[in-house]
């Protein structure tokens, strides 16, 4: 079985001039049509056990724009698994991983690096990065063809700087650069998840905060995953049977 993972499916937005890592809607439709003609796409999750050649389509992060993809799949009698982090559902807040994406998309890495070079908390956080983490996450984003400055910012923030300092730095940057993105427009809400369920889509959990699990104790890993599962099950009134690791690389969860 081939698993194809999606995040951003949208058209170019002039308000996000530096954001290019997305799939155009028409390209998504082309891909679905190709997968259908090739080996076929999973129509029922029970098929997973018996269809080694078919494609399974998955969608991470609970992004509002993914509703478009769900509608396309439903029209074709297909299904996909949508992996939802529960913090935006529960607290109506941006995940740090998406604050990073929004900053890069709106103002670009050049201005970000210029700002961070003058930020005392950022410089202190860089000094306090643990050598074992640098070694553990040496391959982070090595597969990525993004700009080096983008990769540096994402790697430091997502993998190396401690989460408390990271959140504070990102919040300061949102204020400094007057970022006014809407959480409600960015993420799916409970009504959207129930709508996906009606369309025949499957809901899975994607942790609570989308933080690096391999930096947590086993106890906190359990809390992070079980909390997400409980919140989603309570909200959509359906058992959650699927889980997808944030980031997905072995070093991010092992």
Language-model-detected regions and their locations in the chain:
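Catalytic alpha-helical scaffold of carbohydrate-active enzymes acting on polysaccharides/glycoconjugates
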Residues: 1-242, 249-254
């Amino acid at each position: 079985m081939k698993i194809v993972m999606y995040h951003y499916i949208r058209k170019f937005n002039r308000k996000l001039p530096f954001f290019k890592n997305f799939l155009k809607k028409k390209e998504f439709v082309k891909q679905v049509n190709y997968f259908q003609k090739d080996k076929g796409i999973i129509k029922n999750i029970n098929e997973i056990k018996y269809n080694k050649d078919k494609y399974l389509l998955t969608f991470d992060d609970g992004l509002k724009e993914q509703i478009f993809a769900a509608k396309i799949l439903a029209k074709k009698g297909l299904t996909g698994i949508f992996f939802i982090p529960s913090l935006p559902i529960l607290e109506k807040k941006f995940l740090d991983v998406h604050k990073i994406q929004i900053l890069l998309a709106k103002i670009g890495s050049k201005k970000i690096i210029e700002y961070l070079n003058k930020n005392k908390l950022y410089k202190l956080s860089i000094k306090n990065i643990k050598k074992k983490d640098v070694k553990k996450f040496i391959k982070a984003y090595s597969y990525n063809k993004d700009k080096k400055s983008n990769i540096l910012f994402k790697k430091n923030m997502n993998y190396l700087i401690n989460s408390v300092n990271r959140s504070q730095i990102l919040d300061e940057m949102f204020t400094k650069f007057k970022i006014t993105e809407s959480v409600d427009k960015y993420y799916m809400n409970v009504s959207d998840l129930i709508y996906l369920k009606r369309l025949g889509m499957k809901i899975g959990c994607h942790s609570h905060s989308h933080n690096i699990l391999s930096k947590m104790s086993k106890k906190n890993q359990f809390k992070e995953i079980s909390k997400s599962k409980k919140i989603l099950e309570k909200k959509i009134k359906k058992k959650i049977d699927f889980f997808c690791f944030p980031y997905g690389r072995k070093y991010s969860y092992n």
